[in-house]
Amino acid sequence: MLDGKKLGALIKDKRKEKHLKQTEMAKALGMSRTYLSDIENGRYLPSTKTLSRIAILINLDLNVLKMTEIQVVEEGGYDRAAGTCRRQAL
């Protein structure tokens, strides 16, 4: 199971290493600052696509996620740390 708090902390740490403010990173990713904050605080889990975009921006090796026992959620899987399931378009 994906640990949203660990993932969020990792993203936040890497963002700070790059000296990026939340507003700057969110704008570069095309998302709101509040959504990025929710990801960093473990309230929301990013989709695989969003996580890939974040990883590229902050030079995060996705293999690090495996080493820290964080599993990537596939599209259509769980989107919130609370376990709410996203609906897939048919």
UniProtKB/Swiss-Prot annotation:
Keywords: DNA-binding. It comes from the Viruses. InterPro entries: Cro/C1-type_HTH (IPR001387), Lambda_DNA-bd_dom_sf (IPR010982). Residues 11-65 form the HTH cro/C1-type domain. The keyword ATP-binding does not apply. One of its GO terms (molecular function) is DNA binding. Residues 22-41 bind DNA. This is ImmF control region 10 kDa protein. It comes from Bacillus phage phi105. The lineage of its organism: Viruses, Duplodnaviria, Heunggongvirae, Uroviricota, Caudoviricetes.
